[in-house]
C-alpha cells in the first residue's frame, strides 16, 4: 500500500465513528418524551386529550410569606414539603376528565402520593371534567395568575429521599401513564 493510503485510514475510521451515532438518531433513535423517557419540566405532554405541563417543583416553607398561601402546616422533623405546580388543558373538541392519580418515585422505587389539601386552598389541583380549551388552573384564577402559574400537588418527602434523584412524577389516567422528571 502506498504511504499516503496509510495516513487516510485513521481519518476515514474517525469519520465513520463520528457519523455512526448520527445515523442511529436519524433511524428512529428518538424517544417519546413523557412515555419512553421522562419529560422535562416546562414541556406540555398530551394524554387522553389533555395537555399536562409541570411548571416548577419547589420546597415549601410556610414560615415565609410567599409560601403561606400554598400550605399552612410545617413539615414534621426529618421531612420536607414540596409543591409541584402544573397545568392541565383540554386540547380536544370534547369534554375530558383530568387525571386523578399522581405518584412521585425516587431512584430507589420509593413511592409518594400527594398530601390532601383543604378544599378552600386556591392553589390545590382538583381533578375535574374540562370543556374544550378549558384548563386547570382556571384562566384568571389566583393560581393561574400567581408566580407559579399552576395548580399545586403537595408532597411530603423524608429528607434523605430528596437525594435519591431523579425524582419523577407519574400521572396516570385510564390506563395511560406520563412521566416528568422533577427539577429539585
Regions found by a protein language model. Give the residues of each.
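Conserved functional micro-motifs across diverse proteins
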Residues: 2-3, 23, 27-184
